[in-house]
């Protein structure tokens, strides 16, 4: 699975990718501008989006993803409930909080079942 992961904390993103997403091809981007560029130039099966990033809020990117690819699965991965709620309100398909990444494969599998 080709995953676009919007996360501005590089050490955390590396750890999550290594520990929980190693079976996937993951493109980690630290900002909205980098996420927009990656989405425009690549094809992704899934987006993971944090809420607070250096150049804005992830809900803006989620709305853009929804407008561009309405069926693209998007998982909200903020460490704050309010951030996850904003991401879901913007169109995220599911939530997997930062401290719950041990559940990420279950969340991905659930989204894949819903798409079939």
Give the location of each predicted region.
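Conserved acidic segment of CheY-like receiver
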Residues: 1-11, 16-17, 47
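Conserved phosphotransfer cores of two-component systems
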Residues: 40-42, 64-71, 90
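Alpha-helical interaction/dimerization surfaces of two-component signaling modules
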Residues: 16-20, 38, 90
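Acidic, metal-coordinating helix/loop segments flanking the phosphotransfer/catalytic sites
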Residues: 28-46
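Hydrophobic/aromatic residues positioned on beta-strands within the core alpha/beta folds
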Residues: 75-77
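Conserved phosphotransfer microenvironments
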Residues: 45-65, 81
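C-terminal output helix
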Residues: 99-112
